[in-house]
Amino acid sequence: MPVLTLVVGVLTYRRADQLRAGLSVILAQVSILNADGRGVAARVLVVDNDPVGSARSAVASLADSRVKYAHEPVPGISAGRNRALDEASDADLLAFIDDDETPRPGWLTALVDTWLSTRPTAVMGRVFFNVPADADPWVVTGGFFARPRHPTGTEIAVAGAGNLLLDLRQVRALGVRFDPRLGLSGGEDTLFSRLLVRRGGRIVWCDESVADDNVPAKRATRQWVLQRAWRVGNCTALADLYLAGNVAERCVSRVRYTLRGLARIAGGTLRYAVGRLVGSDRHEARGLRTARRGQGMLSGARGTRFDEYARSVA
């Protein structure tokens, strides 16, 4: 049987303990995949985006030849993801997973099986956010950490890169990389996946591939989730703006997301007001979430970007 080569790409930034724990789980799944007769030879790549290379010792402590370490000092998620694309240039497939995620059993084989069925350009799996048990109920009922699901094989128009398998031959043929303009703001995966589809690629959903993300307490707050809602709206509009190929298309994009933003602000504010009136946390929280996304879209339509992952120079 011909052998396909697969690289599991783990991007990391100053999470050595989580990285070490996650790698042990990933390596167990790599062992299963390599031995199960699918004809796939898998290995692991860790891309360390810390300028001082803080993950090097964590990788070295594993003493496992299946794990390669790459230091990418240029700040930003886009730089890290593009480094993974470059380091995996001799592979057929690249599976992205983040350093704060833990894959469930079958995560990797499910991605591969879904890809083998129709050979799409990309396969997106689920990321399940485990919110702390003592989190503000308002945050939970607001659905800030809920994500849509689809039947396996469903084609989708946009994908996140937290659990994403790429057919590298197709990605290279389409000439798509992660845009550095969104490296510190987030949303680089939105633009990347939309560009894949625009150039003729296909992205399909895999519901059986699941990675868990344990949400830190500092992120399960009203302030953080509302800021993230704004950022999601902002990056969605910016991605559309960056996809525009000329002045006319940029004008259309700005108008489109100005109108969408205003509609969300109006609808979200109304739902929030109803929630306050009837004492419904669900309507109040979801209304504010919608309104904040709309505000982010308005800013994105103007070209304003918020670098959520900006780093201190100190």
Regions found by a protein language model. Give the residues of each.
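Short, well-formed alpha-helical segments that are part of the catalytic scaffolds
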Residues: R15-N34
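Short, flexible, basic/aromatic active-site loop/helix in glycosyltransferases
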Residues: G125-R126, V140-A157
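Acidic donor-binding loop at a coil-to-helix junction in glycosyltransferase catalytic cores
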Residues: G183-R194
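A conserved acidic beta->alpha catalytic loop
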Residues: L45-A58, E101
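Glycine-rich, basic loop-to-helix element that forms the pyrophosphate-binding segment
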Residues: E72-S89
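Conserved donor NDP-sugar-binding/catalytic core segment of glycosyltransferases
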Residues: G106-P137
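Non-catalytic, C-terminal membrane-associated alpha-helical segments of glycosyltransferases
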Residues: Q227-R231, N246-A314
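Short aromatic/hydrophobic "clamp" motif used to bind/position activated sugar donors
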Residues: L93-L94
